[in-house]
Structure formats: C-alpha cells, structure tokens
C-alpha cells in the first residue's frame, strides 16, 4: 500500500516510515477514517498514545484540511461553505434523492478565470486551484458525519479539467484503501479543455464526462463562453467522438436554457444537426437541458426560464431521436443550483 505523497495519506505514510513505525500503522489510520469514521487523531485508540500525540503535533487535531464556515439547508439539499488555505472559500452541495441516493457536487477551484457570462463563480476570477486534499475533504467531511457517498460530480466552483490536482483526487476517490468508489460513480463537467479530455480518455475511461455546450453556434458560444475561441466546438466534439470510440461510454451534453438567447427552436434544430453528424449519429450523446438559475452575481443577467420554450426545445430533440432530459433543479432558494455557487458570499465580502 503506497499513497500519493501529494495527499495527506501519503504524507502520513512518509511520517510513519521516517519514525520507523510498522507498516500496518497506515492501514490502522485509514481504517479509522474510512471504516470507523473517526476524524480526530486523539480518538484513534488503536494507535499508541505517543503516536497519536506525534500525529496531532505534525498534522493537527483532525484529519480534515478544510474548515466548516456555514451551512444552508433546503428541501433535499445542503450547501456547505468551507474555508481552505490562504483564507479562501469554496462551496459544496449535498443532494439527497427520495430513493435514498446521496450525490455530492464538489468544487475544484476557488473561483474560475474562464468568464462564462451566466455563471456567478466566474465573475470573481480564479483565486486558487484547490489541492488534492481540499478537493477530497469536501466529500470526507460528509463521510465522517455518516453520509452515504453514492456519487460525486465535479460541477461545483471552477473548471475541473483546468486543475491537475483533480486527477490526483480521482485516484484517491477510487483507491480501494480510501474512498473505494467505482469510477462510474464519478462525473466531471468541462467547458472543453481538450488536453485534459484526452487524459481522461487515456487514464480514466470509466469516469463520466459532461461537456458544457450552451450554444451550437460557434460565434455565439464564444460570446457566452470565451474558451470557445481557444477550443472551438468542432474541435471539442471531435475529441469527444474519439472518447466515445475508445471507451464506448456515453458523453453528456449540458445546455443551459438562457431565455431569448439560446432557447429558440432554431437553436434546438442546430443542436440536432450538430449531434447527428457525430460518431454513430450521436447515439452515445445525452443532452441535459438545464433551466437558467438567476443570480445577481453573474456577469450578465437573464430572465427566468420559459417553461413552454424549454418543453418545445425538448420535443425537437426528442422527436429527432436525440437522448435528452430536462434536469430537475434543487436548491435554487439557497443559491445551490447550477451557476449560482459563491455568488452571495462574494457580494457580502
């Protein structure tokens, strides 16, 4: 058993070895954290008292590297504000489905520098990339409280594929000695960072991938999402086709419905044309239509989603044989929905 030395688990392992502790000590510690849900070194009674004191002196009282600042609750949703290093803050969302499933939407960056016009997170710029421990601790926090970890999505603050630490986090989440999750329980959303998509294909082929499209027209997409100038739609779609070819895995397409901007039937038909021209006529693409969530912190304001227009858009895609769903929304009242994270906290600083 050897852990990545970028992680707290690897650092603890190195510390134990440097102090000539027996190899089984690291297993005792990871069992205490992940099987017994013990967060404080002092409470790991399986360890000798002197070792517990040494761990506290070197790593702090608790195994968590992030600090709880605030919590908000809504029906089926809990949003938590954490403090990370450099006194920065990130948000994490826990969603409980009525069937008993628990999903976690986690952040990969504090802020974001890609400047999508409809997103509150991007309006503050990039403050820092989260470390691997700051990423995984968002889930560990809930695990230690007794929550069931069924699925994790990198759809919180930041562009996940712009932070290399995300790949280390994937390793920790799937490590059988740590979180022990199947890669199919993990989802990454990206605005289209081509080099990192290639890495996912090659090294993490079973992880679910979502591409944020939001407009089928390249010029319009560049206005909404400046990243399109660097990685244009067609180039990203070619890479996604290759991902599907090599992995035989479905790719999800996220499409935020911006009233009067990208929700016309013309847009719907163009999405159909875009996907039908892809590998296997787009049969392994699945479109998630997302109602726009108003937030005063986004660079531009759009109105409430027009339900009739959302339904009409859906029917165009459905009738053309495109796999499509309208995503259920949770946590809008506490700014925990798509595109809302960190907005109100930023305004209050």
Curated annotation (Swiss-Prot):
GO biological process, one term: rRNA base methylation
Binding site for S-adenosyl-L-methionine: 158-159, 189, 212-214, 293
EC number: 2.1.1.224
Cystine pairs: 105-338
GO MF, one annotated term: rRNA binding
Gene3D superfamilies the record matches: 1.10.150.530, Aldolase class I
Pfam families in alphabetical order: Radical_SAM
Residues noted as binding [4Fe-4S] cluster in the record, renumbered to the chain: 112, 116, 119
Catalytic activity reported: adenosine(2503) in 23S rRNA + 2 reduced [2Fe-2S]-[ferredoxin] + 2 S-adenosyl-L-methionine = 8-methyladenosine(2503) in 23S rRNA + 5'-deoxyadenosine + L-methionine + 2 oxidized [2Fe-2S]-[ferredoxin] + S-adenosyl-L-homocysteine
Keywords, ordered alphabetically: 4Fe-4S, Antibiotic resistance, Cytoplasm, Disulfide bond, Iron, Iron-sulfur, Metal-binding, Methyltransferase, Plasmid, rRNA processing, S-adenosyl-L-methionine, Transferase
Cofactor(s) the protein needs: [4Fe-4S] cluster
Function noted in UniProt: Specifically methylates position 8 of adenine 2503 in 23S rRNA. Can also methylate position 2 of A2503 after the primary methylation at position 8 is complete, to form 2,8-dimethyladenosine; however, C8 is its preferred target. Confers resistance to several classes of antibiotics such as phenicols, lincosamides, oxazolidinones, pleuromutilins, and streptogramin A. The antibiotic resistance conferred by Cfr is provided by methylation at the 8 position and is independent of methylation at the 2 position of A2503.
NCBIfam families: CfrAB, PRK14453.1, rSAM_Cfr
Entry similarity comment: Belongs to the radical SAM superfamily. RlmN family. Cfr subfamily.
Protein name: Ribosomal RNA large subunit methyltransferase Cfr
Native organism: Mammaliicoccus sciuri
Source species taxonomy: Bacteria, Bacillati, Bacillota, Bacilli, Bacillales
